[in-house]
């Protein structure tokens, strides 16, 4: 059994957290030959060599100036050439990186390879001679025919090297080594373009500090004005696209801000959706942010060779083209992006909030030792209980309750953040909430910059 594990170096110079989980899952499979594959600058070789001490026999680094500036489609193309050369039985990838945060590249890679695909894996249940069976976050039990590619959630902790562990073999491959078509590589082969980036100021509010006994009043005030809150934060400069498709009605509100002619074409197999897009030639195709939409959109992008912008929070029409805005680098910046291919395609941050759910209580790491009290408080309000990534990562809450860049997006009329520091990747998942109330003993906590009402107090 040969397993290739795709690795991306994070901004901190270490392995991306989701990729670390994918690597650990590969190392657990007895008798498997594990090969690390990455694309980047020559300096990434140091990280790969260090990681081979954990058990990988080989590490392969794709490094060439021709690969620089690649978007997800061009990255998947380069990786697919390396994977074809390695010819593994299985390919393991992390669900997404924290650099691009798109979750597109692994799915695109699987589509290009023609491999079986299982995404959002929570556990690997069985690997047979011809199939792999997994439990996934959204669909439950799934099976794929080998060769297959799986994407792994944050389900484990990567082991540490043993005292006398040995380094594996490092190979560096350039574009010529993998037989790359240079027109499909790097910036030249990327169908999306970042026009500019700027600091992410979205979601910031003017916080009014109140005493603890005013909490009930603040909730009532928030509920009164909840009907005035806009669902999508997209602005419209008056220009419109002639024809736009949505895949399901989830992104309809976003689509209507850039076109008066919007058609919901619904879910279907990737090839059938691609056929309809090619035949009807819309200006843009807008997808939701649910797991199925993210997977299908990436597959359709490969079939049609289209650019795909992920997790957009704002859309505009400019000179007859769709302009897309999305957070990047863990939400710290906003990128303004256009597609060089027609139609433009984007997934947008659709809402996971139950339509009848008026209040969400979010627990942060600051109340990790008071979860029973927080849960009772939420139950008393009839509220849904959610959590930050740090609380989930440390085992105090379930993943399906996580709000943020690597969790779900919510926008309830009332969002009460308790013990939440206000990390930008959490803000990305709740910034469209109606009224935000923050409770934190630290008066300088960033969460207060994104709250309407603040209570400086322990819970």
Task: Briefly describe each language-model feature range.
Residues 1-459:
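N-terminal glycine-rich FAD/FM-binding segment characteristic of electron-transfer flavoproteins
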């Amino acid at each position: 059994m040969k397993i290739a594990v795709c690795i991306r170096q994070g901004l901190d110079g270490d392995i991306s957290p989701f990729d670390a989980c994918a690597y650990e899952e590969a190392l657990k499979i007895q008798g498997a030959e594990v090969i690390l594959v990455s694309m980047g600058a020559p300096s990434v070789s140091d990280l790969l060599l260090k990681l081979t001490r954990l058990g990988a026999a080989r590490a392969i680094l794709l490094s060439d100036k021709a690969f620089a500036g690649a978007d997800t489609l061009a990255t998947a193309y380069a990786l697919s050439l390396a994977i074809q050369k390695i010819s593994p039985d299985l390919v393991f990838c992390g669900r997404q990186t924290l650099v691009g945060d798109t979750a597109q590249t692994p799915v695109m890679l699987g589509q290009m390879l023609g491999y079986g695909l299982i995404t959002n894996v929570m556990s690997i249940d069985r690997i047979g001679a011809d199939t792999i069976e997994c439990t996934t976050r959204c669909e439950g039990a799934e099976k794929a025919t080998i060769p297959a590619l799986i994407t792994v959630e944050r389900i484990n902790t990567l082991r540490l090297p043993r005292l006398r562990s040995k380094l594996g073999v490092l190979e560096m491959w350039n574009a010529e080594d993998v037989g790359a078509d240079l027109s499909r590589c790097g910036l030249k082969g990327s169908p999306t373009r970042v026009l500019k980036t700027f600091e992410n100021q979205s979601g910031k509010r003017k916080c009014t500090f109140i005493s603890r006994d005013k909490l009930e009043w603040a909730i009532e005030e928030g509920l009164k004005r909840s009907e005035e809150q806009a669902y999508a934060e997209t602005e419209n400069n008056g220009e419109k696209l002639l024809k736009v498709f949505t895949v399901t009605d989830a992104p309809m509100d976003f689509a209507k801000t850039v076109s008066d002619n919007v058609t919901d074409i619904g879910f279907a197999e990737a090839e059938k959706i691609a056929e309809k897009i090619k035949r009807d030639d819309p200006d843009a195709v807008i997808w939701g942010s649910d797991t199925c939409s993210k997977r299908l959109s990436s597959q359709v992008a490969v079939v049609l060779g289209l650019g795909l912008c992920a997790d957009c929070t704002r859309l505009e029409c400019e000179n007859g083209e769709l302009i897309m805005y999305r957070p990047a680098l863990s939400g710290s910046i906003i990128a303004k992006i256009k597609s060089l291919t027609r139609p433009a395609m984007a997934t947008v941050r659709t809402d996971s909030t139950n339509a009848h759910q008026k209040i969400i209580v979010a627990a942060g790491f600051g109340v990790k030792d008071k979860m029973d009290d927080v849960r009772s408080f939420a139950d008393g309000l009839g509220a849904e209980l959610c959590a930050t990534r740090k609380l989930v990562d440390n085992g105090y809450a379930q993943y399906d309750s996580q709000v943020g860049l690597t969790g779900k997006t919510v926008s309830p009329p009332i969002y009460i953040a308790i013990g939440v520091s206000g990390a930008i990747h959490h803000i990305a998942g709740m910034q469209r909430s109606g009224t935000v109330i923050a409770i934190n003993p630290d008066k300088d906590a960033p969460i207060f910059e994104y709250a309407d009402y603040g209570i400086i107090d322990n819970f």
